[in-house]
Amino acid sequence: MVLILGVSAGAAGARAVLTHSDQPHLSPLDRVRVPRRAGAPVEEPVLTAIHRMREAALGRDECVSGTAVTCRSELHAEAIRAAAGQSDIDIVDEPLAQLRYLRFTGLLPDTDSVILYDLGCSGLTVTHADCRTDAILASRRSTVLSGDGYDTLVRWRLARGGVDADTRTSRAHREALSEARVVTATDTDTGGRAVVTRSDLAELCAAGLRHSASFVRQVTEETGRHPGALVLLGGCSRSPNLRAGLAGLIGLPIVYDPEPDYVSARGVVLLATHRPSARLRMPRLRVGSAAAPRAGQQGPGRRKLLAAVAVTATLGGTVAGLLGTQDSSAWPREGGTAPTPAQLTEDSVN
């Protein structure tokens, strides 16, 4: 049977699975997660993951027949291609790999289009995809809601309880709340303890979640197409609170894979071409209603734009204020750049 190495590239690093080309839904023969170092380029963890997996396969006398990598932008694709040199690596647009895996597993509903809600450590990407043509109708990205933002809020919540935690520890506690309802954190220096519950996390993230629901509605209004489902992707989608909250706010059927952060890596296995250095891009459809409002209908307008700016400013100010009110001694000194204000970027349909 043919062994394929599937890799997904993201802001937090790379995830890779080694599996048979016709069995990406089963437990992989091997998997690895390579975090991205502070300041490192996106291609570094990707190549590290590929090297580790290939070396491990050789040690087991296994032959990797192909390698495919997902990317979110053309800039990342070009960087990975340049760093890989002569290596035969297929590069695939991430939404295409996600759709292919969902269709393969039967999770993709029989509908004209779906919303891909991909929430990772650095932000939220919302893509309205046409299921009949595997094309992008519209895509937008927001950094108002992110895994890193969640971690900052958890860290602040622990500091209020007298527990000093670094970013990695805060993330571990936040991720633990996807499985447990209550997490007890301990300060290794003082012995102090603080309890964080799922309800605490839901309260901290409520404003960002409401913003993301508005974000989804804005994307669907631009295309003029009603999606048949909301597909939750990315590691943050493991949170039961997030899934329940979005179901109530958006009112669409929820599609969820038990390992949402590995959907891209598994899906790209199905798209490996076995051709030298293939590049699989997702086409973009020209949707008339996405370029201009329908007759008699106004576009998003100034009110919605102002509302989005207000939410962004409020969330940014809230986090900054919360962190600023803490005694500086409650926070460990760490390297790296200071967090930047929340930004909204748009990937328009041409």
Indicate where each model-derived feature is located.
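Gly/Thr-rich phosphate-binding beta-strand-loop-beta motif of the actin/hexokinase/Hsp70
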Residues: 1-24, 106-136, 175-182
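Small-residue (GG/TT-enriched) beta-loop-alpha framework at ligand/catalytic clefts
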Residues: 78, 83-164, 197, 210, ...
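Short beta-strand-loop/turn "lid" adjacent to the catalytic site in phosphate-handling enzymes
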Residues: 56-86, 173-174, 185-189, 194, ...
